[in-house]
């Protein structure tokens, strides 16, 4: 049965999703980090998960626990992103001497859940 539930986990508000035999636990206050993704039928955890984790542990080691949204921040030299079929010119938001376009901040921003 599919379901959505607002709950507290590790001292923070979370959204628990159940669908198709899978459970996901998402922390909106941590940039919608998918803290847990589990195949309930097989008992398989897709990400490292510890039920006793705290909010502080998750913030200090976001790269270890779960799957942060649009993780990792990075930079493009001179604001230029080249792909196989195009060249994109992004605004330079890290000025001289570096002249980069820096991206990746959503994983550090709280998100709002709307029903």
Regions found by a protein language model. Name each.
Residues 1-115:
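Surface-exposed acidic/polar loop and edge beta-strand patches at domain peripheries
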């Amino acid at each position: 049965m599919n379901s959505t539930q607002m709950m507290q986990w590790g001292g923070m508000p979370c959204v628990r999703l159940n669908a198709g035999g899978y459970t996901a636990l998402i922390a909106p206050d941590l940039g919608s980090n998918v803290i847990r993704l589990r195949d309930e039928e097989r008992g398989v955890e897709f990400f490292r998960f510890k039920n006793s984790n705290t909010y502080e542990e998750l913030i200090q080691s976001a790269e270890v626990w779960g799957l942060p949204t649009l993780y990792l921040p990075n930079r493009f030299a001179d604001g230029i992103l080249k792909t196989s079929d195009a060249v994109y010119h992004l605004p330079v938001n890290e000025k001289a001497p570096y002249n980069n376009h820096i991206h990746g901040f959503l994983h550090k921003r709280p998100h709002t859940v709307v029903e």
